From Swiss-Prot:
Induction: Expressed at higher levels under excess phosphate culture conditions. Induced by phosphate starvation via the PhoR/PhoB two-component regulatory system. The keyword Transport applies. The keyword Cytoplasm applies. Gene3D superfamilies: Phosphate transport system protein phou homolog 2, domain 2 (1.20.58.220). It is found in: Cytoplasm. Belongs to the PhoU family. GO terms for molecular function: magnesium ion binding; manganese ion binding; protein homodimerization activity. GO terms for biological process: cellular response to antibiotic; cellular response to heat; cellular response to pH; cellular response to phosphate starvation; cellular response to starvation; intracellular phosphate ion homeostasis; negative regulation of gene expression; negative regulation of phosphate metabolic process. Disruption phenotype: Produces high level of alkaline phosphatase (AP) when grown with excess phosphate. No effect on phosphate uptake, but particular deletion mutants have a severe growth defect, which is largely alleviated by a compensatory mutation in the pstSCAB genes or in the phoRB operon. Accumulates high levels of polyP, approximately 400 nmol of phosphate residues/mg of protein. Higher susceptibility to a diverse range of antibiotics including ampicillin, norfloxacin and gentamicin, and stresses such as starvation, acid pH, heat, peroxide, weak acids and energy inhibitors, especially in stationary phase. One of its GO terms (cellular component) is cytoplasm. The lineage of its organism: Bacteria, Pseudomonadati, Pseudomonadota, Gammaproteobacteria, Enterobacterales. Its main location: cytoplasm. This is Phosphate-specific transport system accessory protein PhoU. Pfam families: PhoU.
Amino acid sequence: MDSLNLNKHISGQFNAELESIRTQVMTMGGMVEQQLSDAITAMHNQDSDLAKRVIEGDKNVNMMEVAIDEACVRIIAKRQPTASDLRLVMVISKTIAELERIGDVADKICRTALEKFSQQHQPLLVSLESLGRHTIQMLHDVLDAFARMDIDEAVRIYREDKKVDQEYEGIVRQLMTYMMEDSRTIPSVLTALFCARSIERIGDRCQNICEFIFYYVKGQDFRHVGGDELDKLLAGKDSDK
């Protein structure tokens, strides 16, 4: 995290506080990544015990989000950070909200798997497992980019979401074909479509975290910007830290 310039602060305690919440974010991110990986495995393998552990573990993710948010509030109230320090605290608060929502997706996947899926649905789950692994890799990579505030890696990950969208669209077409060929599959296909959409949204959450990295490094709000306009903004000079 050299790019965060934590050593510039006169207050060693302020350094420690910033480093602490950054470390907590990475811990929470690792927890969410494991939850998501376990959820995809539980769904694909119809592992009810693993699914139950993921559901139980979601409360730990929620508790961590609250604890980090409270730490951010304390820093703002006590230190009154400015410029890049304030951006960092804001980015951390927004990032943990995205991570918590990804944790919710893992929870929902497991609940759905327990209630709706059985071994007879295995053909429907193969493509969902592939999409899930794709988004897990995106999450892993964006957490790594966040740790280093690596804008080049964030740009690559941001663009990776297009591939996730394409994979999702292919799954939708495949599932619709199942429904048209056999109307008895309609309930299970609708459930699979719900899961596919939930997994696809993880890619969007990772994109949001990329935007937070852009904001921290560049000092500009990149939300709702895409294509050529995004390229132009990212090509600009880095903001003053």
